[in-house]
Amino acid sequence: MTSFEIRQMWLKFFASKNHHIAKSSSLIPRNEANLLWVNAGITPLKKYFDGTQTPPFRRITNVQKCIRTNDIKNVGKTSRHHTFFEMLGNFSIGNYFKKEAIHYAFELLTSPKWFAFPLEKLYITYFFQDQDTYQYWLDLGVEKNHLIPLKSNFWQIGPGPSGPCTEIFFDRGKTFDPRNKELIIQDLENDRFIEIWNIVFSQYNCDPKLPIEKYQELPSKNIDTGAGLERLACILQNTKTNFETDLFFPLIKALEKMTQIKYTGQESFKIIADHLKTLVFAINDGAVLTNEKRGYVLKKLLRRAANEGKKLGLDKPFLHQLVPPTAAMMKDFYKELCTNQEIIAKVLLQQENIFEQTLKTAEKTFLQHLTQNTLSGQNFFKLYDTYGIPEDLILDYAKKKNITTDYQKFQELLHDHQNLSKQNQTSQIHMNKQEESFLQFLTPSEFIGYTNFTCKTKVIKVFDKGIVLEKTPFYANMGGQIEDEGWIDNTKVTKITKLPNGQILHEVQGNFCEGQEVYACIEKTKRNQISYHHTATHLLEAVLQKQLGSHLKKQGSSVGFSSLRYDFNHFEKITPQTLLQIEKEVNQLIQKSVPVKIEQLSIPDAQKKYATLLEQNQKAKYKDKVRIVSIDTFSVDLCGGTHATNTKDLEHFTILSCESISSGIYRIEAVCNNNCQESLNAKLVPYQNDLHQLTQKAKSLQTQNLIFDVKNFPPITQSYQDILNYQKHIKAQQQALVLFEKKVLEYHQKNMVQAESNFLPPQITKKMMLTIEEEKPLEVLKFFMNHIFDKYHLEVLFLSYVQPEKIVFLCKSKTLHAGNLIKEAVSLVCGSGGGNASLAQGGTKKTKNLEQVLNFVKTKLEIN
């Protein structure tokens, strides 16, 4: 049975049991700041299990792409450790429970119509206090000696939903390990008993302060299951390990051809095949290789795979060449890999080249981290973790240079790092505690805000945190669109949130009671501006994908009344010319006055009309209808937000900025409608301030004969081009001012030298003091001091530059220590200063004490 057939059989079986088939979500979690990857089938459904949102379907099945990297060191060493894997799942949210879940698992695994596993090959574990589960399996015909009670079979990861679980193992026979079921009981690594399915009965609210027996029952009991596709394929295809299944072996065969080496189970083949799949799927979902968070994880995988390639004789970049066979291997279920394989290969080649450059300097970096011919454990780990130098390569350098390494300490640090990663992976799927009062509130509330901004309505529920109305024009903060502002009976609404069952909660000051009639009103002007910016965001996204490529995916957005923000992935720097073209194309669509079409379609109708669109989105979000927003055929998207009725409502679109917020992630800020001029002006203010300061400085430098012509900014056109023009203009003016300043300096220097007799005493001596009161740039005075010192071959020159509010002292010397002289002199008048033996500078604001300083210096220089 092929992996494609296994997936299809799983989905077909649960569809026959009235489960909704949900498309795999992206590997990059949405709205999960602390979660690096989707790492379990339940991850995208978490919001339904903890009651944050009401599920559109109570029964769901999926094949979920997952990434886990906490056991990366085991990949290639064991038969079934992977960084990328597919989890087959079936889920019940407040619908069926233990008995049905166990019956479904039994039927799918043992029925001749489905997987047809021999019953005697199955071993089942269950929570030792869960007698219901034990009895259900027994009733289905599982032998008692195949049912194993375990204290560890209880799933909990902190406060929130938790419960007992039952695990299903397949016995591959004594040829894989002579030991018996003690392998399961003692949780020993082995190739005989393969865990193929875990069913979690989520029925309690975990309270870490209490023993399990005291946990409270959940108001909504759930079923969460996961079966590893790779493990099922290994059993059903009768292969020695997962790597010989059709989920890996075509890639291994491509590696054989590339290396001219026969695969006989070598770790390098397995590591490359595993890591490459992870890289291909992650990049396809919009992940970027960076030096932080998930990007750093991918970079480590790439470098580890590249280093394994070197062990097979692949000294040049090769991973990018394996993208087509990877896409071909997975195309039956993931057609998008073939569409995007060119861009994926381009990203990989770019990163492989960067790694090659790293390796060229790796030995030098290695030598820089040695202490007395020893590499400490801390520095070993730093080279491995920070610089990305593979462990094997570090050991090779050490052996070649006869360097002692603290390998044990490195292993300890690596172990600690991996444990931390495991803790993070576990905590990442932590769920919120179910809010029972919200979950149990089922009275419907109608949102009428797409077409109505005001309404007479009544209060149907009062919570501590706010009130729910029978119907409401208020849009809650969701989907990147900010919430509405407004009033209920002249009382300001402070916050709008959506409850688990779809109603809108209005946080509002004042006393309200259930049944009370009220008048709800949103701020129309702000709502309109929000709607315009939402439509502009759709246009921007479509143009970005057209200009930069289909690999581009939204990484976050914020739609407000004064601006919009759109975050996206891209692997190259975005030029100003590209941004101007993007802005131009959005404005062209606005000027075409294209109607914004809103459709509410049933799932079957939407699948007929927009099959590709639904394929690209998570259909599990929607129950019986989907809302589709289309702007001609240029932008078609699933969206629940508010929009303009026509692109002409946007009037104009201006990009305000485009910046890299992290490696490979960019953020565009833009505005439309009457916000353009005001927002653009605000962006231009810093440049106007710079020009004002430049003008003031130019005036202070000007002389009767030297005038600096400050040029004004070019006219504003309400475009990103204005920002570029202002940047260019300021830069040109600053460069011109630098040249002018140099010219003015030369002018003053020349004049001062020509008039030197006006500043010198009648008699020139080797030790000389000068006092200058005429206003001069300090640089001119320093030039003049050097000129006089050298021209007259002086030993010491002490110059006092006297201004109304301060005095500056300069000293140049061949004999006395200039720095010490300045320090002693200014200390007499509470000044400060210093320098070296030959040149020093100081100053004071106590201008009335000049004579005290001069007398001191005269004494020091022995001047009469």
From Swiss-Prot:
It is found in: Cytoplasm. Its EC number is 6.1.1.7. Pfam families: DHHA1 (PF02272), tRNA-synt_2c (PF01411), tRNA_SAD (PF07973). Zn(2+) binds at residues 534, 538, 639, 643. Keywords: Aminoacyl-tRNA synthetase, ATP-binding, Cytoplasm, Ligase, Metal-binding, Nucleotide-binding, Protein biosynthesis, RNA-binding, tRNA-binding, Zinc. It is an enzyme of class 6 (ligase). Its cofactor is Zn(2+). GO terms for molecular function: alanine-tRNA ligase activity; aminoacyl-tRNA deacylase activity; ATP binding; tRNA binding; zinc ion binding. It catalyses: tRNA(Ala) + L-alanine + ATP = L-alanyl-tRNA(Ala) + AMP + diphosphate. The keyword Signal does not apply. Binds 1 zinc ion per subunit. It comes from the Bacteria. GO terms for biological process: alanyl-tRNA aminoacylation. Catalyzes the attachment of alanine to tRNA(Ala) in a two-step reaction: alanine is first activated by ATP to form Ala-AMP and then transferred to the acceptor end of tRNA(Ala). Also edits incorrectly charged Ser-tRNA(Ala) and Gly-tRNA(Ala) via its editing domain. This is Alanine--tRNA ligase. It comes from Onion yellows phytoplasma (strain OY-M).
